């Protein structure tokens, strides 16, 4: 897929990267126990942004854990200095063609399942996913790519360290790409003991105390993609991770070899000259205020006008600002634009819990091809991306607690809106690019199917009104 350069967008790129770094540091969600999501990060050139998802099927490493079905949302951004790759965000310290050095934070995709805890783990303290601070070096040559990464648990979850060494080879032919890879992960005792050990206080019949200590895991993978069009790409992969023998000997581990199958798709917003790099490209500023809906007033009911009322009991509210830059205009000649946004929202919890803030990064499509838009321009918008909350909003925390389900500070974000040009309404040319409207601020965990998002089945909806203007 063709990419474009963002030499004119460094300020926004840096802002986006800063937001995602903060989001990664503030998020703490359980995830699967088999390693790295990086093979499914199809963007490589500055100026690329993308959205997608990958479904994975594979066995749990834990005894009686059964098979796991997981959805990994792909939130992708490749700026000149910063990047977002699925479960990691970072800064490029060196990007010199054949060599690249990154400093990053990453969500460790490892830990006990939070939705269905197997009997073998009953009575044990939860082994949570952690946030790693890492340094990555890559060296690309025609004969292949070598990579070395050092990761340290920055959130004191396991207090462990890991060194990863890998080799991969990129084969391309027309729209096809295949990438076989081999990697080894040297894990210290703290990391392995946390995720695969049994503490003395957790020992039980058939589950003696055990500490595997340091060890080496090996992963063999084959990942591929097919370009359906300039921007749509199909993704697939196979992998097999061989756990260290001392991990396999743990009384809570059932398998030494963990296979995985992956299928997905991604959309690349590259392929055009960036609108924000053009002279006079506007910056969008949006102010919003809204209130929470009742628990049963879900997004589908709202967008179909079956539920348009806010909560009458424990009515919490939000106020926020969003800043955006246009990525694409008039896609394929249609009245369809794509705008990338960074948003900051304050939650007023009315004394029910401490107030908090929420960071959102999302791409939004605007359709304006209505028959009356030549008289009163009307935009129907739908945004999709990622949301990181300082703490789970009261609406989410209370609903999940009532159902005995976990919460997650990191969730999927959707932002459907409908607005009208204020200038067209009142006959003011100066306000032609100022819009008033209403929308829904929606956070959710993809129906409990994504362990990266904490297996949350539920979320929150806030009905809001707003004013947005291009400056």
Predicted feature descriptions by range:
Residues 72-76, 257-284, 459-471:
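Outer-membrane beta-barrel "beta-signal"
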Residues 68-111, 132-135, 139-151, 284-352:
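Glycine- and aromatic-enriched membrane insertion/assembly motifs of diderm outer-membrane
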